[in-house]
Design a protein with these regions (language model features):
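Phosphate-binding site of ATP-dependent enzymes
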Residues: 152-242
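Conserved N-proximal alpha/beta basic substrate-recognition cap immediately N-terminal to
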Residues: 9-120
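Short glycine-rich anion-binding loops that position phosphate/pyrophosphate groups of nucleotides
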Residues: 66-68, 147-148, 268
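Rossmann-like NAD(P)H-binding beta-loop-alpha module
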Residues: 114-138
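ATP-grasp fold ATP-binding core
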Residues: 108-112, 134-152, 175-185
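Extreme N-terminal starter segment of soluble prokaryotic enzymes
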Residues: 1-5
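ATP-dependent carboxylate activation and anion-phosphoryl transfer catalytic cores
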Residues: 229-295
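Short acidic-glycine loop/turn motifs at beta-strand connectors
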Residues: 26, 194-198, 255-257
Length: 295
């Protein structure tokens, strides 16, 4: 029986959905917390283990959302995944793609380098520089944490005095300032789930009343949709730009330019709402992408 380990930050819906899919595929499924990772060097042939399972002896490793932690635990966890990957064990997503996509600045820069349209964005450490960029971006911006997802920590700033206070507060606590032009959109965005170089499911996310955000986690309403060829191509190319085999790609229709833009790419995407509205068994597809279809 094929065996995989899923590194998780809790045993919620996604873990149970993966367990169900694993049973249907005849896979021995081991979900373990990221904090259970153990690394060994020069230690009786051991390398990386989690809850007593050697990660260099399984058929695949699936990484889910990493829990918040300090710099040292995060670096160690990524080091351990790199070591497992270099041992030839399939990991979804590969560690480098996670490192790229979790960083909004780096991932957006690589997406732009791939020739894809992105929102004008400033990143820096100086509140004065950020305030200058605020004016250059039209005086209506979204301030985002450099790391983060699901619409959490986002602030829309549309007047100079508020911008100054927000930027100075972030500067005082040592945050990097990530300031993005607010895109005027029709009240919804698109989420494309890219797996193995193709879009396997997609949806529109309609924002809740009086909220410019569309994330389902904060009340957005999902609706199944078939993407047009342009949006589908953009989603696939954005995932490729950040080296992700699996990605949730967020796109917006820019009403001012008349063209869609890539907002961001998530290399650890959820699929609870997406699988519900599309009736696609995404968990099964994810496991098949990791270690191949049932044989």
């Amino acid at each position: 029986m094929r065996r995989i380990v899923a590194l998780v930050s809790g045993f919620g819906w996604h873990v149970e959905d993966l367990r169900r899919a694993a049973e249907s595929l005849g896979i021995d499924f081991h979900p373990v917390e990221f904090s259970a990772l153990r690394g060994y060097v020069g230690h009786l042939g051991k390398t990386v283990e989690a809850s007593g399972v050697s990660l260099t002896e399984v058929d695949g490793v699936l990484g889910r959302m990493m829990p918040p932690a300090g710099l040292e635990p995060v670096v160690f966890r990524m080091d351990a995944l790199h070591r497992v990957h270099r041992a030839g064990i399939p990991i979804l997503n590969p560690p480098r793609s996670v490192e790229i996509s979790v960083d909004k600045y780096l991932s957006l820069a690589l997406i732009e380098r791939a020739g894809l349209p992105v929102p004008p964005t400033f990143t820096g450490e100086s509140s004065a520089d950020a305030l200058e960029a605020f004016e250059q971006l039209g005086g209506d911006t979204i301030v985002k944490p450099l790391f983060g997802s699901e619409g959490r920590g986002l602030v829309r700033v549309s007047d100079r005095e508020t911008a100054r206070r927000v930027f100075q507060a972030l500067e005082r606590i040592g945050s990097v300032l990530y300031v993005q032009k607010a895109i005027r959109h029709p009240g919804f965005d698109y989420r494309a789930f890219v797996l193995g170089g193709r879009v396997v499911a997609s949806m529109k996310r309609h924002g809740p009343p009086a909220d410019w955000r569309t994330n389902v986690a904060i009340g957005g309403r999902p609706e199944a949709v078939t993407l047009d060829p342009l949006l589908e191509r953009m989603a696939v190319e954005a995932a490729r730009a950040v080296e992700a085999e699996m990605a949730g790609v967020d796109l917006l229709d820019d009403l001012d330019t008349g063209r869609p833009v890539i907002i961001e790419v998530n290399a650890v995407p959820g699929w609870k709402a997406l699988s519900k509205v599309t009736n696609v068994d995404i968990a099964k597809l994810v496991l098949e992408q990791l270690i191949g279809p049932q044989r």
